[in-house]
UniProtKB/Swiss-Prot annotation:
Induction: By N-acylhomoserine lactone (AHL). Pathway: Pigment biosynthesis; violacein biosynthesis. The lineage of its organism: Bacteria, Pseudomonadati, Pseudomonadota, Betaproteobacteria, Neisseriales. Keywords: Antibiotic biosynthesis, Multifunctional enzyme, Oxidoreductase. Violacein production is used as a biosensor for the detection of quorum-sensing AHL production. Violacein possesses antibacterial, antiviral, antimicrobial, antileishmanial, trypanocidal and potential antitumoral activities. NCBIfam families: VioB (TIGR04492). Its EC number is 1.21.98.-, 1.11.1.6. It catalyses: 2 H2O2 = O2 + 2 H2O; 2 2-iminio-3-(indol-3-yl)propanoate + H2O2 = indole-3-pyruvate imine dimer + 2 H2O. It comes from Chromobacterium violaceum (strain ATCC 12472 / DSM 30191 / JCM 1249 / CCUG 213 / NBRC 12614 / NCIMB 9131 / NCTC 9757 / MK). It holds the Pfam family Ferritin-like. This is 2-imino-3-(indol-3-yl)propanoate dimerase. GO terms for biological process: antibiotic biosynthetic process.
Amino acid sequence: MSILDFPRIHFRGWARVNAPTANRDPHGHIDMASNTVAMAGEPFDLARHPTEFHRHLRSLGPRFGLDGRADPEGPFSLAEGYNAAGNNHFSWESATVSHVQWDGGEADRGDGLVGARLALWGHYNDYLRTTFNRARWVDSDPTRRDAAQIYAGQFTISPAGAGPGTPWLFTADIDDSHGARWTRGGHIAERGGHFLDEEFGLARLFQFSVPKDHPHFLFHPGPFDSEAWRRLQLALEDDDVLGLTVQYALFNMSTPPQPNSPVFHDMVGVVGLWRRGELASYPAGRLLRPRQPGLGDLTLRVSGGRVALNLACAIPFSTRAAQPSAPDRLTPDLGAKLPLGDLLLRDEDGALLARVPQALYQDYWTNHGIVDLPLLREPRGSLTLSSELAEWREQDWVTQSDASNLYLEAPDRRHGRFFPESIALRSYFRGEARARPDIPHRIEGMGLVGVESRQDGDAAEWRLTGLRPGPARIVLDDGAEAIPLRVLPDDWALDDATVEEVDYAFLYRHVMAYYELVYPFMSDKVFSLADRCKCETYARLMWQMCDPQNRNKSYYMPSTRELSAPKARLFLKYLAHVEGQARLQAPPPAGPARIESKAQLAAELRKAVDLELSVMLQYLYAAYSIPNYAQGQQRVRDGAWTAEQLQLACGSGDRRRDGGIRAALLEIAHEEMIHYLVVNNLLMALGEPFYAGVPLMGEAARQAFGLDTEFALEPFSESTLARFVRLEWPHFIPAPGKSIADCYAAIRQAFLDLPDLFGGEAGKRGGEHHLFLNELTNRAHPGYQLEVFDRDSALFGIAFVTDQGEGGALDSPHYEHSHFQRLREMSARIMAQSAPFEPALPALRNPVLDESPGCQRVADGRARALMALYQGVYELMFAMMAQHFAVKPLGSLRRSRLMNAAIDLMTGLLRPLSCALMNLPSGIAGRTAGPPLPGPVDTRSYDDYALGCRMLARRCERLLEQASMLEPGWLPDAQMELLDFYRRQMLDLACGKLSREA
């Protein structure tokens, strides 16, 4: 039965309480039904500064000196209390395990758990993402000492001597707040003449429970040498055990050293098992109540031939010292428990059941008031515990609820709306759960609440409806038990306020002024609510803190929680008001730059060639950085990848259409190659020569193209993929910055506007090509081969490029197959992985042979040799293309031997060299090399076709010589043979042994 059961973990320390006291209102300045403040009998003029009201409170008597005695010049004022600037923070200080008990009941002070530290924290703040979160102590009715509620979010146990970074032994989230139980005055018999004697003599018992099925009910998995810890975890496996109960008593408040100081309380507590049928926040067991003032409640359990008593707050201390006896003590020393003689436990027949020796309960700091005794006989009926000086009698029926210190909305009578809330109550007869259909109760206090009852098995459900604003109590049975609550002010008229009306002045007048007057800690420690500049700065945070959804969180503001829903919503309206003050001063639309002449158009087309080449190389680099399927299989065998990751990166093993991300990127790169050729055809249709293009990365690309997206050769990753999505961003989806589509918009407009772009000769110019065109193009235009010869074919080519890249429009059939959408789908598959997956090899970013800004120089000798060969082959490929176009052919590119040779070099040499470089060390620790960022190429061509082919043969010969200088095995024989094949073919073309077209 909770802490009366075994095992038990006892702890001791102090509690720090920083509760505000100016709201206790001994002079009647505060109307708690409306949250308004009066001064000198009149409503306080909110145009006056709040400090005027604070000075008024300080001027009121009576006043007291630092010794707590009456003193007209003393620093303490009854009107302000001892801590007017309190911020409701609550924490445990130096709370450590003092001893443990298991089945035998004997205290073990040598267990490994002794000395462990316990802590009570507030809730994690999702908005500010804070650590070191403080719990809160809130008095729902500040005029009463039994209306305290603790809002805590986390309970932890850490090893002895633990620091902030030491792993905890146990942690659990606390979902519900818990209120003070068994609040009693006179817990210290001696009175010292201090104006706070009543506070010093208060004792309160608190209890909360944490369920073991909560996802954040966690024991540290590491080993820990403690028998008590082992037994506790074993006991938690019992189906009858719901979790852990933590009970702690607070008493002996420290003497405030000066006004506006937090205070400390002695704290003793125990951690035990929370069993099925027990309330989470009310002590379990048979309840006995005292007959004499100064004594407190107690519970007991009779079972298995033993009786366990919880006397934590039952017996007062005799004396209290003026000051703590040592610097490390936070409260004054207490004398012994009052000597009441041996306490005899009897049943209703008067039979003696157990004897509590005086020496046992006076040894309080050893047992913390939890004592176990042999049972002399089984009890009959109600119980009493008594001596000649004291008596406790059992209260047969006890009804209580875990819902305590409730806040109910007042009715909105204008619209006939009421806002009921339901709570569950449990009734116990002599400690055993019983159904109790008729629970005696009455309503006391300023507020009024309606109660509708419904029985549900052993539990009752009450539907509570606020009827009249103000603090109230539902008094149960004979009045010893009550459910404190507060009906919030009737502020429903404020719901009519519009966003435009709710400016700072409105919010201050209707909400914040009250808190600035009654709770000055904000202006003292955070920022003054009377400062518009601060409130406007933190308008969003103010709404988040005051959101009614967070009322049960420790960080909720106001800490005192008497804010009605209509007033809370004003913070949201104020935030909208502040946000609405930001007016967009729309910049003039950028629009495409106007191209004024044919020469400018040719220059823009050459820039577009550079752009398409630069984009294509980025896709190729990312694709080649992903291992091929065979390499991926090896990674699966090595345990680096899963089979699912292999499928994602490299596709299926049948090498058909599904090639994974690697193949998808290569497909897009191939289509970018076609865009490159289309733009060159546009250029050549103007009478300009073929342009090989210059790939640009980094700052050079930004300067040339004017795009915000960075250009870089980098291995595939989530961030690389995000860059690609941004590169292909459509013009029809609004986004800041210039897009690739914007580049083509100006070119398209120029083809529409400029006259005399095409020569008088009819017929096509440039070259035909029919690879890597999508199926939609084939269905609609099966004869299309990229040809450009007039305005219409030029506009068609531009539309082909932009539709394939961005999709044309959201409702276009091209959108689904566009680069943009395919990349987004690829990104979605990557992001859907349960863990991040980076399939790429650790290749360098922008690898180069020679130092260059924004690039990384490769130092490894073998990699450098292959990079140099790559650069030579890359240049040869473009030289072949340039020579093809130099003689202005009208035939298909696919039939041109020079174009076929260029494509063979791309696939037969550049591709394997790229993959090889991706797998070679770069000379930089942890990074492989990669195909280099190509430099400018020499694409000299000749009007004499034969001469041009002989010059190409010489280039092949030089590359063969360069390749032959490599170490054996660095370059496969097939690639050497391919270079020699085209050396011979170029010579055959030069001397006419082969036709120019296949």
